[in-house]
């Protein structure tokens, strides 16, 4: 179709022009299965890797296709992710950071094995927990300092986070952290090239766009899953992405987060199958991430 081809070549051109400043690319995963899959997918055979330990985190550097890759394992959950990302920015000055790992699916159309690359990321646990109003059934006692802005989940009222950016000294309110548009365009171009499978052997989807949600909680609860999708329009949930997105936003470093679905975050029947699907989900995310990195590396 001519229009589709025109869109494809327009995106390819934009990515090629913009990607060239990405001389140093940070690549991060949270834990061992994700990290092994990422290195297996991204590193060329026989790559000459130089390891540097900083405050307990090991950073692996390699020169590949004229780019410097800096790879590290953040550790699981929000604070670990934020701390290690700031370490990487302070010591290695990456021009862009990509995360590869697993997540739980909130969107009912998703299945384990699918890969999702959200365009925006929100906090799950940035909220006020309020008392019930004893005089009004179904209501809560709202403090004078707090103004509800978003639908609540029982007594939990989500709120924005206040952030200071590099080059500024005034905190401002942020609801969602957007991914870098040029990295996001690179994902649009390269993702369809990847052939990945679900646990049952059927073709897995690579979904671009929507909202991702992060919090310091392993989500395996159907009621919150339904609420997050219906009210916040969040499509996946995990434990690091928004923290990394916020650190990137504060430092003005482009970010992209790629997630393979290991489970349905409580939407399944019976016991959660995250452990059974981890290897496949991590590998699928890493394969998509590797294609995006290759697109950046090959740009002139």
Could you tell me what each predicted segment is?
Residues 25-33, 38:
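Gly/serine-rich nucleotide phosphate-binding loop at the start of the catalytic core
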Residues 38-45, 64-65:
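A short, Lys/Arg-enriched amphipathic alpha-helix followed by its capping loop at the start of a domain
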């Amino acid at each position: 179709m001519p229009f589709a081809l025109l869109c494809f070549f327009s995106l390819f051109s934009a990515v090629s022009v913009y990607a060239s400043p990405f001389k140093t690319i940070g690549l991060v995963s949270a834990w061992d299965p994700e990290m092994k899959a990422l290195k297996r997918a991204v590193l060329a055979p026989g790559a000459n890797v130089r390891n540097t330990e900083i405050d307990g985190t090991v950073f692996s550097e390699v020169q590949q296709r004229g780019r410097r890759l800096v790879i590290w394992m953040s550790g699981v959950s929000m604070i670990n992710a934020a701390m290690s990302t700031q370490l990487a920015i302070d010591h290695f000055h990456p021009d862009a950071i990509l995360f590869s790992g697993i997540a739980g699916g909130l969107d009912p159309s998703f299945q384990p094995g699918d890969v999702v690359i959200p365009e925006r990321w929100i906090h799950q646990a940035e909220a006020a927990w309020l008392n019930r109003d004893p005089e009004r059934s179904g209501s809560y006692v709202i403090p004078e300092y707090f103004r509800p802005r978003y639908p609540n989940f029982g007594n939990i009222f989500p709120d924005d986070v206040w952030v200071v950016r590099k080059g500024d000294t005034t905190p401002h309110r942020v609801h969602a952290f957007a991914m870098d548009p040029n990295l996001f365009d690179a994902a649009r171009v390269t993702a369809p090239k990847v052939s990945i499978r679900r646990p049952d052997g059927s073709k897995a989807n690579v979904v671009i766009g929507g909202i991702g949600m992060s919090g310091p909680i392993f989500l395996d609860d159907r009621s919150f899953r339904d609420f997050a999708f219906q009210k916040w329009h969040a499509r996946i949930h995990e434990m690091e992405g928004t923290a990394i997105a916020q650190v990137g936003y504060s430092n003005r470093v482009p970010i992209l987060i790629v997630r393979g679905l290991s489970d349905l975050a409580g939407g399944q029947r019976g016991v959660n199958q995250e452990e059974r699907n981890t290897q496949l989900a991590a590998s699928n995310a890493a394969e998509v991430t590797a294609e995006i990195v290759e697109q950046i590396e090959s740009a002139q």
